[in-house]
């Protein structure tokens, strides 16, 4: 889950000091996966924990690479825990702004995550130089403003080998709008760049025609495609399996 974890998880229970919080002291947010807590990406012990997990996968298993999704981030409401407040105050000589979307406050936190991702990439390459370091964030404006993920800078700093941008939209015009962005074109010139297409959820199946239309749009922009996710592509579908399979032949 990146920095996101279930509140009852072992890591959250054993290391309450690793959790960050909102201004009101609350430590949870509600998302598609229910209620979650967030590990503090600015805390050195959290960074070490994540790094060790990633290096274990890289060295102990025959993995071609590793991918970090939109949860390798932090919702911008968070960062008001004691450790982060002290760090920000030490570096800037002032307390964090009450406005969690204050541009300087957003940039400071985003820069810290960027620095960690650069360090993590270097750690992976040190033990497995040809491992693919893949990232799968949301489209840039949302990722940066709401999740402190400055993934365009990650690409510019050579901290990513592959980019798969999640564009989970049912409206084709809105979907295409996210493809036709300068940051997508810039990334595409530097590393393999693709688009994540939503193929459905258990309670929200997606018609194959919508998937086909989006794939065609992506191909027109010369981008790659990844589907989220395997089971919904074939099993939780409004059409018979044979029909969906036939659309890929």
Question: Residue locations for each model-derived region?
Answer:
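Conserved beta-strand edge residues that scaffold enzyme active sites
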Residues: 3-6, 72, 140, 169, ...
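Substrate-binding cleft of secreted/luminal carbohydrate-active enzymes
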Residues: 159-175, 182-249
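Intrinsic disorder/low-complexity segments enriched in polar/charged and small flexible residues
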Residues: 20, 40, 107-110, 156, ...
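Amphipathic, alpha-helical segments enriched in basic
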Residues: 25, 29-32, 38, 95, ...
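Extracytoplasmic/secreted cell-surface and envelope-processing proteins
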Residues: 6-12, 75-78, 143-145, 172-176, ...
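Generic hydrophobic, helix-prone segments enriched in Leu/Val/Ile
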Residues: 11-12, 84-91, 241-248
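Active-site neighborhood of glycoside hydrolase catalytic domains
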Residues: 45, 49-195, 220-222
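Active-site-adjacent "subsite" loops/lids of carbohydrate-active enzymes
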Residues: 2-60
């Amino acid at each position: 889950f990146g920095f996101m974890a279930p509140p009852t998880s072992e890591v959250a229970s054993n290391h309450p000091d690793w959790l960050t919080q909102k201004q009101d002291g609350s430590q949870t947010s509600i998302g598609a996966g229910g209620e979650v807590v967030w590990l503090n990406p600015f805390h050195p012990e959290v960074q070490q924990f994540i790094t060790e997990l990633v290096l274990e996968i890289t060295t102990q298993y025959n993995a071609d690479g590793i991918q970090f999704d939109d949860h390798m981030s932090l919702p911008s409401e968070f960062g008001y825990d004691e450790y982060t407040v002290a760090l920000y105050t030490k570096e800037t000589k002032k307390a964090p702004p009450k406005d969690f979307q204050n541009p300087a406050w957003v940039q400071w936190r985003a820069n810290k995550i960027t620095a960690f991702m650069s360090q993590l990439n270097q750690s992976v390459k040190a033990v497995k130089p040809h491992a693919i370091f893949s990232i799968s964030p949301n489209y840039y404006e949302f990722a940066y403003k709401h999740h402190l993920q400055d993934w365009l800078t990650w690409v510019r700093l050579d901290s990513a080998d592959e980019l798969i941008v999640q564009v989970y939209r049912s409206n084709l015009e809105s979907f295409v709008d996210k493809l036709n962005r300068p940051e997508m074109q810039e990334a595409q010139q530097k590393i393999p760049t693709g688009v994540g297409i939503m193929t459905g959820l258990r309670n929200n199946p997606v018609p194959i025609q919508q998937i086909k239309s989006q794939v065609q749009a992506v191909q027109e922009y010369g981008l790659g495609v990844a589907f989220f996710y395997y089971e919904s592509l074939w099993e939780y579908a409004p059409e018979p399996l044979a029909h969906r399979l036939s659309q890929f032949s």
